[in-house]
Amino acid sequence: MRYKASTLRIIEKLKELYPEGLCSLQYEKDYELLFAVRLSAQCTDARVNLVTPALFTRFPTLEAFAAADPREVGEYIHSCGFYNGKSKDLVACAQQLLERFDGKVPDNMEDLTSLPGVGRKTANLILGDVYGQPSYVCDTHCIRITGRLGITDGSKDPVKVEQQLRKAIPPAESGPFCHRMVLFGRDVCTARSPKCEDCPLKVDCAQGKKLK
């Protein structure tokens, strides 16, 4: 498949800005990343990273999570917001991982999205970061920035954006690209008052070109 030269330049520039292109959530076990991503909904990764050390110490195994009282789990994740729903999802997810998948995090979209609290965004992240598969993680940063850049058509629908990114971004670049979108969205292309004049991508940005 042929890709737009401007998109490839954006990918390379982002590599220069953020060489690692890694998820900022901290974890040691595969299921810990799955749970951390669930906690990150409507919450910052920085806040999740403050919460998970104590959470994963209190519940050090899937079995411990599966046997946990959601109310106690909720006490550990209270500051992440929406803790009642999230705590129930973590416990139910742990139970299903043990009952249906022998304690292993699934390696395919269908099984992942069948788990409590796991949507396409979370599943894509797991497929990319855990299994090294092509993954198009369409969070708010990615949706906003790719629309501004002109890589996508500006749709706010995560599924539509994912479909467009699959055609626009080489599979091998997909996971790191989406992680870099998050970092770039925090540093430069913010939701409000983006730093367009100082943006290193403005030469290839659809909105940036309008500023000239």
Give the predicted meaning of each segment.
Residues R2-K212:
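Catalytic cores of DNA base-excision repair glycosylases
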